[in-house]
Amino acid sequence: MRFKQLDKITEMVPGERISAFRHVNADEDYLRDHFPLFPVMPGVLMLEALYQASCWLIRATEGFENSVLMLKEAKNVKFADFMEPNQTLLISAEILKLEQDTVLIKATGSKGETVAVSARLVIGKSNLASRNEDLESLDVFLRDFLAGQLAKLTS
């Protein structure tokens, strides 16, 4: 993940829900350009935070069964408020439907009691080895690496 959009996972109930947060620091690189006179967290990064939290929930739910989780669709995306420097995005996501190849997630990002972003996400699941058996060792590496990253986010 080039842009890690979660600082900490505060609660996780595998198979059900996750809560996490992302603090918008005043020195974030993107704030210089987005926007110079009114710096705010880009909406796409707010959506990315929802997606990343959702992926951790799926991984924990399935015991890191799949090495690759990809956003297939973002439905009903609503941006309702800005995230300015020194504000914290409180993220919550819940599993609505868990299928063999996809998961439907309902996610929101709030600042305090105000919803800033909400969406329903369709996330696809797979392993690299399902397309090329020679990549099975990479699947194992990725699952182990991601398990270590989750441990850091929950400690």
Regions found by a protein language model. Give the residues of each.
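Catalytic strand-loop segment that frames the active site of acyl-thioester-processing enzymes
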Residues: M1-M41, M46
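Hydrophobic core residues within well-ordered beta-strands of beta-rich domains
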Residues: F3-Q5, L89, V103
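Hydrophobic residues on conserved beta-strands that form the core of alpha/beta folds
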Residues: L6, L71-A74, S118
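Conserved positions in beta-strands of structured domains
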Residues: D7-T10, K75, A80, S92-L96, ...
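HotDog/MaoC-like acyl-thioester-processing domains
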Residues: G15, P85, L96-S155
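Beta-strand residues in well-ordered beta-sheet regions across diverse protein folds
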Residues: F21, S92, K106-T108
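Short, well-structured hydrophobic secondary-structure segments
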Residues: P39-R59
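Hydrophobic beta-strand-centered segment that forms part of the acyl-chain substrate-binding groove
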Residues: S54-L90, G124-S126
